[in-house]
């Protein structure tokens, strides 16, 4: 929703190019009063698009989540909260969208790799930027049903613990404010608002 406002990029160069990229951008934009802002230097963490999927077992009235070690969750934790300083995080199945792959294909691939469930027809809940002040990462959030018969393999992609959490347990975590993954929190709110229609 830019409303036709102008943006001018004077320069853009890559400062770091590895698994992720960091670009330096000199940019100005049209302000709300109609004038152009002065040039500003911005750094953009180029992460690419990612998927996340809420796996729902309606028969067991539970969700399938994963727990794994994520270094940034350890480094970024506040030092005054030692109880949460272990680096393991409970989250949705999630991953990067590979080159030449659709978001839906990535959902199916990552779900099989991380949990062993072979899903079909994932439904897009929405898409959003995870941290638009500094990152280009866009999340495609999906919903998919799972049943015991869809568990076709162990799931061997990474060092991951697969968790089956009751829907009530998920909603309790949401109410207590102990979900520390934004994708999971958004999905839990979505499920809370839509469970009667599923």
State the predicted function of each range.
Residues 18-19, 27-31, 131-151, 163:
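Active-site-adjacent beta-strand/loop module that shapes the phosphate/pyrophosphate-binding cleft
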Residues 42-45, 59-109:
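Conserved Nudix-box catalytic region and its N-terminal flanking loop in Nudix hydrolases
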Residues 1-11, 67, 81-82, 86-88, ...:
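Nudix hydrolase/Nudix homology domain
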Residues 8, 118-125:
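A short coil-to-beta-strand element that immediately follows conserved catalytic motifs
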Residues 17-60, 68, 78:
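Acidic, metal-coordinating catalytic segment for phosphate/diphosphate chemistry
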Residues 12-15, 126-131:
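Short, solvent-exposed loop/turn elements at beta->coil junctions and helix N-caps
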Residues 30-32, 57-59, 69, 144-149, ...:
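Short loop segments at secondary-structure junctions
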Residues 1-27:
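N-terminal presequences and immediately downstream first alpha-helices
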């Amino acid at each position: 929703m830019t409303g036709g406002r102008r943006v001018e990029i004077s320069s853009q160069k890559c400062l770091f190019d590895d698994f992720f990229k960091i670009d330096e951008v000199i940019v100005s934009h049209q302000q709300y009063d109609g004038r152009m802002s002065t040039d500003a230097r911005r750094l953009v963490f180029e992460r690419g698009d990612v998927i996340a999927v809420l796996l729902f077992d309606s028969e067991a009235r539970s969700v399938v989540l994963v727990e794994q070690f994520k270094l940034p969750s350890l480094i970024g934790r506040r030092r005054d909260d030692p109880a949460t300083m272990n680096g393991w995080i409970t989250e949705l199945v999630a991953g990067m969208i590979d080159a030449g792959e659709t978001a839906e294909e990535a959902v199916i691939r990552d779900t099989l790799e991380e949990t062993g469930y072979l899903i079909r027809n994932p439904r897009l809940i929405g898409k959003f930027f995870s941290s638009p002040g500094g990152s280009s990462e866009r999340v495609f959030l999906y919903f998919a049903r799972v049943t015991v018969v869809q568990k076709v393999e162990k799931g061997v992609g990474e060092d991951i613990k697969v968790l089956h959490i009751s829907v009530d347990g998920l909603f309790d975590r949401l109410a207590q404010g102990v979900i520390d993954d934004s994708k999971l929190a958004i999905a839990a709110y979505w499920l809370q608002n839509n469970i009667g229609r599923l």
